UniProtKB/Swiss-Prot annotation:
The keyword Nucleotide-binding applies. The keyword Cell membrane does not apply. Belongs to the peptidase S16 family. It comes from Spinacia oleracea (Spinach). Its EC number is 3.4.21.53. This is Lon protease homolog 2, peroxisomal. It comes from the Eukaryota. Keywords: ATP-binding, Hydrolase, Nucleotide-binding, Peroxisome, Protease, Serine protease. The active site is at 784, 827.
Amino acid sequence: MAEAVELPSRLGILAFRNKVLLPGAIIRIRCTSPSSVKLVEQELWQREEKGLIGIVPVRDASESASVAPVLYPGGGTDSGERNVKSQPGLSDSRKADGKSQQEAVHWHTRGVAARALHLSRGVEKPSGRVTYTVVLEGLCRFRVMELNSRGNYYTARISPLDITKADMEQAQQDPDFVSLARQFKVTAVELISVLEQKQKTGGRTKVLLETVPVHKLADIFVASFEISFEEQLCMLDSIDLKVRLSKATELVDRHLQSIRVAEKITQKVEGQLSKSQREFLLRQQMRAIKEELGDNDDDEDDVAVLERKMQSAGMPANIWKHAQRELRRLKKMQPQQPGYSSSRVYLELLADLPWQNATEEQKLDLRAAKERLDSDHYGLVKVKQRIIEYLAVRKLKPDARGPILCFVGPPGVGKTSLAASISAALGRKFIRISLGGVKDEADIRGHRRTYIGSMPGRLIDGIKRVGVSNPVMLLDEIDKTGSDVRGDPASALLEVLDPEQNKTFNDHYLNVPYDLSKVIFVATANKVQPIPPPLLDRMEVIELPGYTPEEKARIAMQYLIPRVMDQHGLSSEFLQISEDMVKLIIQRYTREAGVRNLERNLSALARAAAVKVAEQDNATAVSKDFHQFTSPVEESRLAEGAEVEMEVIPMGVDNREISNALQVMSPLIVDETMLENVLGPPRYDDRETAERVSNPGVSVGLVWTAFGGEVQFVEASVMAGKGELRLTGQLGDVIKESAQIALTWVRARAMELNLVATGEINLMEGRDIHIHFPAGAVPKDGPSAGVTLVTALVSLLSQKRMRADTAMTGEMTLRGLVLPVGGVKDKVLAAHRYGIKRVILPERNLKDLVEVPSAVLSNLEIIYAKRMEVLEQAFEGGCPWRQRARL
């Protein structure tokens, strides 16, 4: 508890609107306005523990000034400070920023001196505004004699009103004071006893009763619970000890009585709850008895409710007739009969389906839709342009049967979120139907009701859950459906996605037609090949390419890092990740088309930071019991747009505990050392390609997968044998044939390539060749490895190394022609991702490079191949063939 403090003649003044700080009370405030920040810097921050400020209550100008005297502005002083002399009944009035209206600040003439127990400084991001968090302890009362404006804040000449030791000794001789003190302590002990029973606290408060003078106890107790502003002012103005004790006893007793009344109400409510629980158990027993007797009135009531619900569902006439027939059948059945439950569940489904309920479409704002797409997704310019075109057609002709969009691309490039953005732009509800791993046609069409455990298909169930007949429905992973003896889900989707047929979609469980023509379908897939051609014909494929490293870095800074920080309860005050570190993560730890692995790595860093923050004993969440105050004078220097957040500290809290609890932790900055500690050693190395092609017989190819483009190494080795070719690496038939073609072409041109001496005929005589595709657990197939295979064989047999900065793709024929291949865009992006500088492509794939970002092409040298003479570009020092040889 604070000892007597000698106050200076002048204090810096901080105004509290409709709130009073009493001596002995401890509060936490947050200062954000320029005036309060300046006050804290000048009076507290620079003076450290010696700093004192005055807390003076103020009230709104609209409130009556009769309760508290007010101050008004006077003339200037020699020191340049504006003088404001104290006179009752007047106010501080001034023109704000040259405006004609005037603001009146009603200052109370008494305040409380306070000292800072703890002071911390912070900077808000991104504004850079400086804020202070201060823990203040009220010391003693004072009277405001003169108020002055010093720069951005106020100071006041004060007169202390503290009780002296002589005054206290004299009061203790007064029988009335002794009686009041005894009565106050008795009431306080009763309050502590009640609180101790409710909250298991009060030990430290009892110590206060024995050690703190009674006149200070009065202020401390009153400050510990909520009272009105007028009562707070009354306590502040109670200079006379007997008046103060009398008022404090009254307030403490009133608080005690309110707690006791609340306890009585709580006990009464708990008694009523016990009675309700008893009635509930009896009713449950009564219901069980009625079920045994076959006389259950509750079920009859439920059936009546179901009937009313069906009547209000808005079913078409033919379906309503079917539902009535089923309802009559249900009414004739007893609840114990086997078909009762299934029939009732079926009717509940009919009643819950949105037959007429539909979302009213908002007026399409293409500009807002474009802004939404740009804010949710980075890049994807052509994809977003196609979506805007789709929305423009919907705006001009809402009932148009537009194409069904199918977003195809690697995982993590934003396919699902694009569908959600379309839903938001149209103002419709969004429902996602996952088709991954679906092999049963009944998952789409539903099970027939004759089977036990039958249920509707995923589409009807989704319509029921979303509650409207015109949602945006996402058919996610449509390429992952399979087929077995139970049917082909893709065949069932033919009816769903055909605008001519889905008007009368027939779910096997529902057994009545349902109109799906109002639903906007959007599909996603990783690759097109598994989708059956008839189903693919009903959709418009929009390909989403993988992201470049530069795009990933921008996505991480704009989207991923803020989301990860929010998910882990962090902010930039705890963790900072620079763009350079993000690029390092992309380069060393993720080589993917999308950004999911990048987000996982960022989450790992956030978790590591969360552990360090949580391990700090004093890193506690902000209290929910904060009270927010706004300055009454918006235009004055007192608090221009000021906002002060206050938290009352409980009685008896040790000041050292408060200081320790508010220590500020410096942010954790991610560097290379932290990356290795959290994410482990780098998974990828820019030198990998150079190291793997350092020996002859290795070439670098480019392949396409469902997860985007990848670099594929091809290794060849020769040994003594019988002229056989061995292939390993889990290869398909097409790629095996490409290897045979490559070997045949090399054998036919062995002399031109200087692979055999003049006169030799058989290149393979007495030796075998083994070709291996690393990553043997991954299936590989396709014709695009032809050029890569030839390069590996020529490198092996000529003992010349391939260039480490070059990768290639292309199908080849027996005559040496290089044919175009697919997936060129993803392959080029993969080469750029792996740090490759030169790419050999079929000449007829030139048109496909239009879709590759210019930032990627500017960093690559593209070499076009029409025939196999491009081999010269693949080797260091050129190809070893003879002059004038035509390949």
